[in-house]
Amino acid sequence: LTGAARVSVTESFFALGGDSISAIRLVSHARRGGLYLEVRDVFRYPDPRGLAAVGVKVAAVVERLPEVGPLRATPVAQWFLEEAGPIDRFNQAVSVRPAADIDPVVIETALRSLIKRHGALRLRYACSSGLEILSPEAAPQFSLDLLDEGLGEAAASVVLSSASEGLSPSEGRMVVGVWNAAQRELLLVIHHLSIDGVSWRVLLEELALLCAGETLPSLGHGLQDWMGYLTSEAARPERIGELEYWQDQTRAQYCLPLDGVVPETENTLGNAAHHSYVLDAQHTRLVLEAPSVYRAEINDLLIAALGMALGRWSKEAGRDVGSVVIDLEGHGREPGASGLDLTQTIGWFTSLYPVRLDLDHIDIADAFAGGDSAGHVLMRSKEVLHSIPDKGLGYGVLERLNAETGLQLRAQSGAPIVFNYLGSFEQVLEHGWQLCESGLVGVEQDSGQRRQHLIDVNAILTASGAMQVGWSYPVDMIDAGVIARVAEYFGDALIALSTHCHARPLAQRWSLVDLEAGVRNRITALELGELEVLYPDMERVVALTPLQQGLVFESIALPVGAMDPYHVNLALELAGDVDPDRVTASWRSIVQRHEILRLGLPGSVQGQGVGVIRGLSHFDFRVITASETVVLEDVLEADRREGFDLCSAPLFRGRLILRGSLAPWLVISNHHVVMDGWSLSVLMKDLLDSYAGIGLGAHLAWWERAEEIALRPLDTAQAYWRSYLSECDGPCVLDLPVSGEAGSGFGEVKEVLSEALTADLLRFGRRVGITPAIVVQGAYMLVVRQLAGSNQVMIGTTRSGRSGIDPREDSGVGLYINTLPVYSEVKDNLSVGDWLSGLQQDQAEQGSYEHLALNDVQRLVPGGESGSGLFEAMYVFENYPERASSAQGAGALQARLISAFDATQYPLALQAFGAGELGLRLTYDRGRFGQEAAGHVMQQVLHILDQFRDLGSERV
């Protein structure tokens, strides 16, 4: 797909020259191999490692409308049918050669099957009724034309050139095929209403498969599905809201410097001349590789080059450069939020939309010299193109499918020039079939067909790796020498831009358009530039979740020298074949897989909910040789004293402690802002599997979840929490005197319930219809009620943040959790069962509103505005799924947890865990509780749980 001889697992598809068209083909090939991707995945995870991680093995079930009956024309087809004039011979054609001798009957049979399979190949057009997809039975029977082998080369060329005469849209004859036995070549001519560049790639692949007797890939959605979606989009308020944007693109009229030449004839195909410019393969490869330096795509560079060429032309004509307006052709397969799968669909999907490139204050001469101005033009081009909504889909929808907006858009003058980048056609197709030329071949068209633009520029990559750029123009308006000169300017601009990118790019190469929408409004372009200087290896800028922002704020506010309560560390004892080098390599692999482990929190934007993912060189793992007498608690204490610098990455580290003949320890340390407890179990399985060489499955990248949370609406969540807490009089404060034995830091009390009590509580929960988590929570809240001295009781609870909707969540690493209040007014007339059921129902309803930050919820409660917390008691029920490593036998690594430490800023926190025997861990602030008082709290919880086993209808 890219022409690269070798591709590493971390190389970007786009850095290798991939584009949006070849991305569609990549998805198609992956699906045929059993890995199901979406096109957007290629843009989000452009390297093989990333795609392998997000791909799934099960194909989605596609429900598609029948490919038959009246069909509304796509926007581009509607322009053609309404304004182009003669339509019968409007076609695209390719010439292909099978790998081996083949009976033309096999080709004919295969083409008949494809016409039956794809509705676009059965289109019929009538002026009175418009487009219609004929049923396979009603469509004309396709017959392959056989070229007389006795014809001379010149005569055969004439026959092939005139093959388009066999097309008849009014009869539904949209496909003509000619088999040239002498050359073993198949010429396919298809009416443009039925085909486009992407469709050719689909068609030729399927033709080769059918001729080889293989099964075709399953179809996605069809033209009827697509046009149903576009029609609904034309009426959608959000899409109509794009009107002003599109009007702004063409509001400043742009004219080519043609000195007022008045054409003597119409601008038709018959009156057009053509010029070809070829950029050699060596320079083309540099051009294809250059955009990645600016996190750009090839179209960004091509439009920048065309803008430079037009700017130079205008400057030489004595005109101000200003802005240039170019119509850009795209493949048009932009399903947006529709979820439509068009990777195997044939049709004319092309989108056409205006792009305004501002060249004000650009030194054109410096740009052509490859100076800083070249970088500024490329940055502007990238920013313009990446800001276009849905890659231009809406322009055609509003111009042609909505009568009101269409009148307004068509009232403005259009761009005089159109650009289309076709990418490369795969020269070697399935089963050795080959294109005879680099792409589309010339077959006669209707000479009277009207052209939409003065200049058409079409770029394509040839079989030799060169870039061929075709320029079409009206002969009576533009001199051939002028076009040749501008074509040279375009080539010079391509070389200048690639030279600039490879040799002396700008220091700031990130733009706000490089960021996901959820983080883009949290940072300015100036601040982004500062981050780029501060973090030269910056790979991504991410939005922090509400809880992450809260943890950062609290860690920063700690007094100098204070222990950070969000510093988590634990120790594992390793067994098996412990190879330090392999452990280090496995650690590196999980840090590469889970980018949140390379998070840094820049001080310059710490109040704005922004984090930076740094390069893989920022992973912290060391192998330490210690004596056999080393004390584990000393190691963990030293690690906690070392702490973390939040501004630096990583906030996650590991130490392999070798202890002579004793089992090694693996000490894992992280700031809580990086991940939650669930994530730790994921990491351990990934580490052990990686050590054993076992492949890791799909996982949800943290930035995806953070982005999804950042884009959730806040107003509905605020309304919910305001209503939920409307009867709350204020924060729930624990009214306890400081114990005489109080000290500093945190202490803990642990208890393990007997197997019998655990079983009884599980039965109680099933009888009442509540989960074990709610059983323990209810007992804890009743104790907190006593400590607070009020029937209004509120505690904080930790929500997992993993809904199960996306199966990749289960293997994701990050801080998914959020801490939010649970409020209840304990009323004596309520039964225990009803009260606990009410708690469970409330928390179930909160699932859709868990993305609001705790401090935002706090402001909705009387007294919460003062800055004091809503509650002083926390509760978490840990029920992470068990994750046994797949590694077994020789070479495997085993790990056993021997120590763990984490803390909280809340004076009282109860943690419940386990299954067969439920465990409880009460963490307490020694400044508020003594050990005896904390032990008494634990005993009260146990006492209430013991009472629950026999209760149900009794009052609270």
PLM region spans:
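Gly/Ser/Thr-rich phosphate-binding loops and adjoining beta-strand/alpha-helix segments
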Residues: 6-11, 24-28, 87-109, 170-189, ...
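Extended, hydrophobic beta-loop-alpha segments that form or line the acyl/peptidyl-thioester binding
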Residues: 36-40, 118, 122, 204-207, ...
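A short, small/polar-residue-rich loop/turn motif at beta-strand boundaries
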Residues: 100-116, 132-171, 240-243, 362-385, ...
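Regions immediately C-terminal to embedded phosphopantetheine-bearing carrier domains
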Residues: 1-84, 105, 109, 221-225, ...
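Non-catalytic, low-complexity flexible loops and terminal extensions
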Residues: 63-66, 159, 207-272, 321, ...
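His-Asp-centered acyl/peptidyl-transfer active-site segments
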Residues: 84-91, 108, 119-120, 233-243, ...
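Acyl-group handoff/entry surfaces in thioester-processing enzymes
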Residues: 29, 67-135, 150-233, 254-259, ...
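A short N-terminal helical cap/helix-turn-helix that marks the beginning
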Residues: 2, 41-46, 58-59, 121-125, ...
